[in-house]
Regions:
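Intrinsically disordered, low-complexity Ser/Thr/Pro/Gly-rich regulatory segments
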Residues: 1-217
Length: 217
């Protein structure tokens, strides 16, 4: 079920690119892994979108997307520092948001599940974000990430990039999704802009949205 708006945009974007998509693919470490910890590993995690394009080859054939729809944006430099332990973590440790990238037993279970679903041992892993801040180039070169996703491509998808692609490729044929139809209506009404209109504002302190952002870290 596509509950998150960013996830719906990702879905439409990938379908525009010719991919078949599925959602909320669950994975977890195997119970006989030597580093298995029942208190941490017994409940499955899931990845938001898995996309498959039979007309492509190599890592482009399968795209796996984890959506981080944080209103304050995604600071790639800060998050990687938290994963590395060089920056203080929020209340919920950052590695829990990136188990498949950072924890070998989870990465193994993740890759096994993706291969079982798609038949492909390597793929493109993308983190979809509302807005990207910091240095994103360090992520695919990080030794831990490279070791945990060998042969895979790692990078980011921004909402701006996906939305611009959708607006550019939309025709007058009614779109199949609500997000696609909304994009068509906004485009038809002339309510789209080629550049960023306003910078994002953080949620008001003490609001539910602010609490969610703090917990997501």
């Amino acid at each position: 079920m596509k509950e998150d708006v960013l996830e719906q945009v990702v879905d439409d974007y990938l379908q525009f690119k010719g991919y078949f998509t599925t959602h909320n693919v669950r994975f977890r470490p195997r119970t006989d892994h030597p580093e298995y910890v029942s208190q941490q590993d017994s409940v499955a995690s899931d990845v938001d979108v898995v996309a498959y394009n039979p007309n492509l080859s190599g890592v482009q054939r399968v795209v796996v997307v984890s959506c981080k729809s944080w209103q304050t944006g995604f600071d790639a430099t800060a998050k990687l520092a938290e994963l590395r332990g060089t920056k203080k973590n929020p209340k919920r440790p950052t590695w829990r948001h990136f188990r498949e990238l950072w924890v070998p037993r989870w990465s193994e279970g993740f890759r096994t599940q993706i291969e079982a679903l798609t038949g492909e041992p390597v793929f493109s892993y993308r983190i979809a974000v509302t807005r990207l801040k910091g240095d994103a180039t360090a992520w695919p070169e990080d030794p831990t990430i490279k070791a945990n996703l060998p042969g895979c491509s790692v990078g980011f998808l921004t909402l701006e990039e996906m939305w611009a692609t959708m607006l550019d490729e939309l025709t007058t044929t009614p779109a199949a999704s609500e997000i696609g139809r909304l994009a068509q209506l906004l485009k038809a009404a002339g309510l789209t802009a080629p550049t960023v209109v306003a910078p994002p504002a953080a949620p008001p302190p003490g609001s539910d949205a602010a609490a969610d952002e703090e917990d997501d870290g």
